[in-house]
Amino acid sequence: MERPELPIGLPEDIEEKKAAARSWFEGLRDTICASFEALEDELEGPLSDQEPGRFVAKDWSRENGAGGGGRMSMMEGRVFEKVGVHTSTVHGEFSPDFRAQIPGAKDDPRFWASGISLIAHPVNPNVPAVHMNTRMVVTSSRWFGGGADLTPVLSRRRTQEDEDSQLFHKAMEIACRNHAVADYDAYKAWCDDYFFLKHRNEARGIGGIFYDWLHSNEDAGGWDADFAFTRDVGRAFSMVYPKIVRSNFNKLWTEADRDEQLIRRGRYVEFNLLYDRGTIFGLKTGGNVESILSSLPPVVRWP
């Protein structure tokens, strides 16, 4: 989708709005981490004789005098081979070559951004990988963006008719349909277009939703309406993905399933390093490299 021209100007209470968004993202992080640790405790199938995983949190600050930082929460366990749930709140100035790409930054390079980002790579190939992020960005304008998408790693499960796909899509649809500022059909199509490996002519997963530059006018509810929708995206994800994990994590798998999982993870690596907007944004704004690249799976294979 082509980037729109957003209105210039910020509300008088923008600092309060920044604080509210940051608080939400950090609270959602804690909720999701607790939920994922509970899944580690509940496992009864393969690998249940191993110790359940626990998140290890590491705070970081931007270097070279740039402002802000974040918390990187990583876990390696018996359900999740690798999962990262990260929050960050950063501010500073965009580099000259990056300003033209960002709404409201052409004439004033200052920015502030806060958000949550999550990628989970489960052990069991029957459990799909998942990605979710939501964020608020402020320049001389302001907007929300984010989304969530599901990546089954087994070809027999990587269909729109699969029960996991149906459950995930329904959760995202409800999150959108409850808000007039959201356009589910457009966000679903945007996700399909965004998470596509052009060099392979194939989708990364089964989709979900993706949105950016959400800046509603006051007649439509303004910032409050955009923030309410963004919160519901996080809530929907935090409820639906654990359901999907529970329905699959006790199933048996074969070596062939594991091989297929590792090959599919290779596609994840290719997308994140070649196309992912969040990865590029983080690296160009002095983000934490370890946190940014933690989205990459722990073990990968290319045929």
Swiss-Prot record:
The active site is at residue 131. Pathway: Porphyrin-containing compound metabolism; protoporphyrin-IX biosynthesis; protoporphyrinogen-IX from coproporphyrinogen-III (O2 route): step 1/1. The record marks 199 as: Important for dimerization. Its EC number is 1.3.3.3. SUPFAM superfamilies: Coproporphyrinogen III oxidase. GO terms for molecular function: coproporphyrinogen oxidase activity; metal ion binding; protein homodimerization activity. It catalyses: coproporphyrinogen III + O2 + 2 H(+) = protoporphyrinogen IX + 2 CO2 + 2 H2O. It is an enzyme of class 1 (oxidoreductase). Substrate binds at residues 117, 133-135, 286-288. Homodimer. One of its GO terms (biological process) is protoporphyrinogen IX biosynthetic process. Belongs to the aerobic coproporphyrinogen-III oxidase family. PANTHER family: COPROPORPHYRINOGEN III OXIDASE, MITOCHONDRIAL, OXYGEN-DEPENDENT COPROPORPHYRINOGEN-III OXIDASE, MITOCHONDRIAL. One of its GO terms (cellular component) is cytoplasm. Residues 268-303 are annotated as: Important for dimerization. A divalent metal cation binds at residues 121, 131, 169, 199. This is Oxygen-dependent coproporphyrinogen-III oxidase. Gene3D superfamilies: Coproporphyrinogen III oxidase, aerobic (3.40.1500.10). Keywords: Cytoplasm, Heme biosynthesis, Metal-binding, Oxidoreductase, Porphyrin biosynthesis. Its cofactor is a divalent metal cation. HAMAP family: Coprogen_oxidas (MF_00333). Its main location: cytoplasm. It holds the Pfam family Coprogen_oxidas. Involved in the heme biosynthesis. Catalyzes the aerobic oxidative decarboxylation of propionate groups of rings A and B of coproporphyrinogen-III to yield the vinyl groups in protoporphyrinogen-IX. It comes from the Bacteria. It is found in: Cytoplasm.
